[in-house]
Regions:
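N-terminal Rossmann-like NAD(P)+-binding domain of SDR-like oxidoreductases, especially those catalyzing
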Residues: 1-84
Length: 84
C-alpha cells in the first residue's frame, strides 16, 4: 500500500479561539501534520487554552510547542527542524 505524504503546517496561537479551530479543521482533514505553537499567556483564562490543547493532543498528527513569537532563537530552531 502506498503511503500518502502529509503536508506539515504551522499554526500560531493554537490554544486560542481561532488557532484551535484552524488546527482542529486541518487535523480533521487527515492530510496534514500540524505543529501548533502558543505561549499560553494570561490574556484570558489559561485553563480554557490548556483544555483546548488536551483536545488537540489526542490526535497523533498534532505536535505542540510552547513558544512565544518573540523568542527569535527558538523560532529559528523550529524552522530549522521542520519543513513547512
Amino acid at each position: 500500500m502506498r503511503k500518502i505524504k502529509k503536508n506539515k503546517i504551522l499554526i500560531t496561537g493554537c490554544a486560542g479561539f481561532i488557532g484551535f479551530h484552524c488546527s482542529a479543521a486541518f487535523l480533521k482533514n487527515k492530510k496534514f501534520l500540524v505543529i501548533g505553537i502558543d505561549n499560553i499567556n494570561n490574556y484570558y483564562d489559561q485553563n480554557l487554552k490548556l483544555n483546548r490543547l488536551k483536545i488537540l493532543k489526542k490526535d497523533n498528527n498534532f505536535t505542540f510547542v510552547k513558544i512565544d513569537m518573540n523568542e527569535e532563537k527558538k523560532i529559528y530552531k523550529l524552522f530549522e527542524e521542520n519543513k513547512f
